[in-house]
Amino acid sequence: MHKRLDIVGRFYAQYDEDSRVEATRQGQMEYRTTMEYIHRHAQPGARLLEVGAGTGRYSIALAREGYDVTALELLEHNLEQRRQKSAGLSGLRAQQGDALDLSRVEDGEFDMTLVLGPMYHLYDPIEVRTAIREAIRVTKPGGVMLFAFLSVYAIMGNNYLKGNARYGIQENFGPDFRVLHFPEQLFTGYDIAEFEALFEDFPVRQLTTAAADGILELASGRRDFDLPDEEFEGWVRYHLATCEKRELLGHSSHLLYICRKN
C-alpha cells in the first residue's frame, strides 16, 4: 500500500490530469466515450459510486446532471482539488478512500460503480481481485460497473517507438511475451483477453469492452496531427460506432470493461 501510494502520489502531485482530459483530443474522446456509456446504463437520478475519482472530472459533471454521486479518492492532493471545484454542489459526497477497502460502503448500495483509474496502478494479483470484488460487492444486483484499464500494446506503440523500443519490450513483457505487472510500474497495461479473464470467477456478466480513446494518442504524436472541431465531432461519431470492434481495441490507450452484477 505505502509503495503504491508513494509512486502514484508523486506522479499526480506534479501531473495535471484535468488538462489532459479537457485540452487534448485524446482526453476529450476518452471523456466523451466514458460519459456515453455511463448515460446508456444509468437511469436519471441513479446512485453512482466513483472509486478513484481523481479531481472530480466525472463525479462533478454527473452530480450536475442530477445523479446522486459518492466519489472516493485515495490521494488527499486530488481530494482537496475536488472539494474546491465542487463547493456548494449538491448531490456529491467526496471522501478519501481506497479501491482495496470500501468497508464504509454497504453491500449493494449503488446502482452503478465506476472504477476509472485504480486498475492502472494495481499490480499484485490479490489486490487486483480485491478491487474487483469490492466494486461488485457495493453494486446492487442488476447494477452496472465500468472498469477502465490500459492496453499494453497501446503503451508500447505510444511510448516506446522513440528510440527505446528494446527497453519497452523488457519493461512490459517476459521472455515468452507474457505481460508483466510489478510495483515499480507507474502504469500497468493489460492484454485485453487477460483483463476480461479477471472477471470470470465473479458474479457478473460482461456487457462489452470498448475503446475509450481509440488511436488518438498515437495519432496525436504526429507533427501534422490536426483535428479541428468539426472534424473531431465527425471522428467522435465514427469512434462511438466502432469502439467495440475487437480488431480496434488494442490500439486504444484507455479501455472500458463494462459488466452487470448478477
Residue ranges and their predicted role:
Residues 1-44, 57, 61, 145-173:
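Conserved class I S-adenosyl-L-methionine
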Residues 57-101:
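Class I SAM-dependent methyltransferase SAM/SAH-binding core
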Residues 103-113:
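A short acidic, Gly/Pro-enriched loop at the edge of an enzyme's catalytic core
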Residues 112-126:
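A short SAM/SAH-binding and catalytic strip from SAM-dependent methyltransferases
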Residues 186-203, 209:
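Short alpha-helix
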Residues 208-262:
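A C-terminal cap/extension of S-adenosyl-L-methionine-dependent methyltransferases
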